[in-house]
């Protein structure tokens, strides 16, 4: 350090290599490529797959003193995991005895119906279980059950419609002419030849 301080400014500059002024590269606004970029998840498709795996039932005619926790405990232990359990309440805040249960698995709603439909509660009340189906899945299943029309039948129906149209148009173009008797035809022939002889 002492030796460098003793040197003059000219000596320090002369000792450094002559490289001239270094130009800095212009920064580009392009984003740098990121490694291992994860593809974006399609939220709609993910949500649709989750919804299609659910199953839902409505249980009615329950005692009014039954709580949501009791309903959930019953179905979780006997059927399977539940996503949501809710009770319907009246304007006075009292339970109507109607519970909505959404299961995590698609087949649990059918199992709950088979196991608890018509079962007695407190020895007097009959439980009523209804399976709530997704309307979009109902439409899809109905469309799948309808068989597509074959090409042969479709072309035959089209050709039949065209031929019927042609027949109707031909019938309209040709009016019904009255048929002439043999006497009328002979008379016309005599008149024709008689006029030719006069000429």
UniProtKB/Swiss-Prot annotation:
Its main location: nucleus. InterPro entries: ALYREF_mRNA_export, FoP_C, Nucleotide-bd_a/b_plait_sf, RBD_domain_sf, RRM_dom, Yra1/Mlo3_RRM. Residues 1-41, 144-199 are annotated as: Disordered. Residues 55-134 form the RRM domain. Residues 19-35, 163-179 have a biased composition (Basic residues). One of its GO terms (biological process) is siRNA catabolic process. GO terms for molecular function: mRNA binding. Residues 148-161 have a biased composition (Polar residues). It comes from the Eukaryota. Keywords: mRNA transport, Nucleus, RNA-binding, Transport. Interacts with rpn15/dss1, mex67 and uap56. This is mRNA export protein mlo3. It comes from Schizosaccharomyces pombe (strain 972 / ATCC 24843). The gene is mlo3.
